[in-house]
Amino acid sequence: MSMVYFNIFLAFIVSLVGLLMYRSHLMSSLLCLEGMMLSLFVMMSVTILNNHFTLASMAPIILLVFAACEAALGLSLLVMVSNTYGTDYVQNLNLLQC
C-alpha cells in the first residue's frame, strides 16, 4: 500500500473517529461527514487514474453530486434546528421527545 493511499485512508479514519466522538453537535457531525466524502472522492480519483479505468471516470463526479446534496440538506436541517431550538444539538432532532 503506497503512502498516498495510506494518507487518504488515514484521513477517512480520522473523520470517522471525529464523527463518533463529536456527535453531540450537528455542525461537527456535518464537517466530519464532509471529510469522509472528500477522502472517498480523492481515493476514487486516485484509483481510477492509477488503474486507467476510463469507464468509471464519472464515479467521482457522481459522488461529489451526492456530497453536495448531503451538505445542502444538512445545512438546511442545521438552520431549521438552530432557529427552532437555539442550539445545534443532535438530541433536538429526536421526534419522540416531548
UniProtKB/Swiss-Prot annotation:
Top-level taxon: Eukaryota
Keyword Membrane: yes
Known EC number: 7.1.1.2
Major localisation: mitochondrion
Entry-linked InterPro entries: NADH_UbQ_OxRdtase_chain4L/K, NUOK/Mnh_C1-like
Subcellular location: Mitochondrion inner membrane
UniProt xrefs under Gene3D superfamilies: 1.10.287.3510
Pfam family, one: Oxidored_q2
Topology within the bilayer: Multi-pass membrane protein
GO cellular component, one term: respiratory chain complex I
Keywords for this protein: Electron transport, Membrane, Mitochondrion, Mitochondrion inner membrane, NAD, Respiratory chain, Translocase, Transmembrane, Transmembrane helix, Transport, Ubiquinone
One GO process term, biological-process aspect: ATP synthesis coupled electron transport
Membrane-spanning segments: 1-21, 29-49, 61-81
UniProt key word Translocase: yes
Reactions it catalyzes: a ubiquinone + NADH + 5 H(+)(in) = a ubiquinol + NAD(+) + 4 H(+)(out)
Gene Ontology MF, one: NADH dehydrogenase (ubiquinone) activity
Quaternary structure annotation from Swiss-Prot or TrEMBL: Core subunit of respiratory chain NADH dehydrogenase (Complex I) which is composed of 45 different subunits.
Family label: Belongs to the complex I subunit 4L family.
Described purpose of this protein according to its UniProt entry: Core subunit of the mitochondrial membrane respiratory chain NADH dehydrogenase (Complex I) which catalyzes electron transfer from NADH through the respiratory chain, using ubiquinone as an electron acceptor. Part of the enzyme membrane arm which is embedded in the lipid bilayer and involved in proton translocation.
Protein's name in the database: NADH-ubiquinone oxidoreductase chain 4L
Organism expressing this protein natively: Callorhinus ursinus
Origin organism lineage: Eukaryota, Metazoa, Chordata, Craniata, Vertebrata
Gene, per the UniProt record: MT-ND4L
